[in-house]
Amino acid sequence: MVRSVWKGPFVEASLLKKADAARASGRHDVIKIWSRRSTILPQFVGLTFGVYNGQKHVPVSVNEEMVGHKFGEFSPTRTFHGHAGDKKSKKG
């Protein structure tokens, strides 16, 4: 479901603060964030965020195509190791 227009996009206040500080300083360090639910705004384009996936911070470089999506979409939390193979084919 899409968030209603009158509410506007959700962005953590601390995240906005960190992004503004990074823009003002001109440094391009990785900004560590834990807010996977925050929406990517146009002012974040060009910055690199370390999005926490439960184990580590995954670096996400924001580009124009990502605007409007959530940070959590670009930092997978689960790894798929494949389904169990056929025991008959492994035995022979």
UniProtKB/Swiss-Prot annotation:
Matches recorded under InterPro entries: Ribosomal_uS19, Ribosomal_uS19_bac-type, Ribosomal_uS19_CS, Ribosomal_uS19_SF
Record's keyword annotation contains Cytoplasm: no
Gene Ontology MF term list: rRNA binding; structural constituent of ribosome
Pfam family, one: Ribosomal_S19
This protein's UniProt keywords: Ribonucleoprotein, Ribosomal protein, RNA-binding, rRNA-binding
Gene Ontology terms describing biological process: ribosomal small subunit assembly; translation
Gene3D superfamilies with a match to the protein in the record: 30s Ribosomal Protein S19, Chain A
Cellular component aspect of the GO annotation: cytoplasm; small ribosomal subunit
Signal peptide extent: none
Keyword Nucleotide-binding appears in the UniProt entry: no
Function: Protein S19 forms a complex with S13 that binds strongly to the 16S ribosomal RNA.
Family, as annotated: Belongs to the universal ribosomal protein uS19 family.
Protein name, as recorded: Small ribosomal subunit protein uS19
Organism, scientific name: Rhodopseudomonas palustris (strain ATCC BAA-98 / CGA009)
Annotated gene: rpsS
